[in-house]
């Protein structure tokens, strides 16, 4: 820690003058004469040792009390200063540092060609907090509101499915946090128990790894409950270009052995490393599910910016999953409010269990909670809405459905009558 602070302090004065006066934000990646080393086909042990040195310096910075106390501008200065020091030591590729002020990220490339980054802000929980609400008790309560159909049908469906066993499998890939003192996790734990009792055998993976996300095809329904963002980086050895891609953030920490294990995906930029943790891109899914390995699966993502942002919608994630055989993919444009997203998931899956197809189930959720999260936000008395409304979009077949027992559909029809 002392060495890290010393390096920051020593480099900060010298570097930040250079940063603020000589180089515009995007120029770090486009200095003439500076090119990234060509990517190798595999990672060597030497490559991984170098990356681990870089990761150790980055995580020492981002995990420090001093960094936690900084505002975003101060974090940017500290991150750039640290990366310039690492560049001088040969642990970051010259010319690869890129500032993305809009997405609060500094990206860079390791000498071996793997992509990395430093967040300037912690992933945000888009909540309706007490200070923004007329009524602070607007959180979805346990048990959540079941709606008329589910309330009426619950006992008969539960009885039927207890006799016949589960009709399908679902996994919630939960990587919002480590679940300790979590304000989110209890809701997902409740959903797991409720859906399992209704016949959809549901598991929660609270230690999601890159390897786990290659097994989503084992489920009828896979739910991605993780943070997400945009990652901006530069590519090209002689003619550099800036690219931006949506990414899914995991809590899985980078290690020497895992870097070797994931080397092929790291070099292919299907996995990147941010703040010493693994993140995945759309190409990860496209590569993992070649040959239709995701067939007959519905994917529901709660990830922020999974489908891009207003004015720059990005269907790369959805296309990658559909190319792997997924029947349908649901995701959000823009950053989505936590409670709205969770409520939409709850209502949508409940109506899938009742036998509705994904198109009808999603429309029911929108009718219940609002077409977008600002409709929901204002209905709850919110006073400080975020800049852009987040809304769910369905890709693939709107007719995709779970293979539920006839009793589920019969109960739903009886309730609706």
Language-model features, listed with the residues they occupy:
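Sec-dependent signal peptide cleavage junction
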Residues: 21-36
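Non-catalytic propeptide/linker segments at domain boundaries
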Residues: 63-194, 239
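A domain-level signal for caspase-like cysteine endopeptidase catalytic cores
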Residues: 47-63, 140-259, 263
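Bacterial N-terminal signal peptides that target proteins for export
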Residues: 2-12
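Structural alpha-beta junctions
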Residues: 89, 192-204, 321-332
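Active-site-proximal C-terminal subdomain of hydrolase catalytic domains
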Residues: 298-416
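Hydrophobic core
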Residues: 13-21
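Cysteine protease catalytic core and zymogen-processing segment of caspase-like enzymes
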Residues: 231-327
């Amino acid at each position: 820690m002392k060495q890290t602070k010393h390096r920051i302090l020593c480099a900060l004065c010298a570097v930040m003058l250079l940063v603020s006066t000589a180089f515009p934000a995007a120029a770090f990646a486009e200095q003439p004469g500076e090119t990234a080393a060509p990517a190798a086909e595999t990672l060597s042990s030497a490559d991984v040792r170098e990356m681990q040195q870089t990761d150790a310096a980055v995580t020492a910075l981002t995990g420090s009390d001093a960094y936690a106390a900084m505002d975003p501008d101060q974090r940017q200065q500290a991150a750039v200063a640290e990366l310039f020091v690492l560049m001088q030591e040969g642990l970051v590729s010259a010319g690869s540092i890129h500032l993305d002020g809009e997405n609060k990220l500094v990206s860079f490339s390791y000498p071996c060609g793997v992509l990395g980054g430093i967040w300037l802000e912690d992933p945000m929980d888009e909540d309706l907090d007490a200070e923004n609400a007329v009524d602070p008790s607007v959180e979805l309560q346990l048990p959540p509101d079941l709606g008329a159909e589910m309330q009426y049908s619950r006992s008969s469906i539960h009885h039927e499915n207890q006799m016949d066993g589960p009709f399908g499998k679902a996994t919630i890939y939960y990587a919002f946090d480590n679940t300790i003192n979590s304000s989110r996790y209890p809701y997902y734990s409740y959903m797991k128990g409720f859906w399992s009792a209704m016949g959809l055998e549901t598991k929660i993976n609270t230690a999601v790894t890159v390897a786990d996300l290659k097994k989503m095809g084992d489920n009828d329904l896979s739910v991605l409950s993780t943070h997400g963002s945009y990652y901006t980086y530069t590519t090209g050895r002689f003619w550099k270009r800036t690219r931006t891609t949506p990414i899914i953030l995991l809590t899985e920490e980078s290690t020497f052995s895992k870097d070797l294990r994931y080397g092929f995906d790291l070099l292919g930029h299907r996995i990147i490393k941010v703040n010493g943790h693994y993140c995945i891109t759309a190409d990860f899914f496209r590569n993992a599910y070649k040959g239709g390995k995701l067939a007959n699966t519905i994917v529901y993502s709660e990830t922020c910016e999974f489908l891009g942002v207003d004015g720059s919608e990005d269907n790369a994630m959805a296309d990658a999953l559909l190319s792997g055989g997924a029947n349908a993919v649901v995701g959000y444009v823009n950053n989505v409010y936590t409670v709205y997203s969770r409520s939409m998931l709850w209502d949508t899956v409940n109506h899938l269990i009742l036998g509705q197809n994904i198109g009808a189930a999603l429309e029911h959720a929108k009718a219940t909670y609002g077409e977008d999260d600002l409709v929901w936000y204002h209905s709850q008395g919110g006073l400080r809405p975020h800049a852009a409304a987040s809304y769910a979009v369905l890709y693939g077949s709107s007719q995709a459905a779970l293979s539920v027992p006839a009793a589920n559909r019969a109960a739903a029809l009886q309730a609706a009558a």
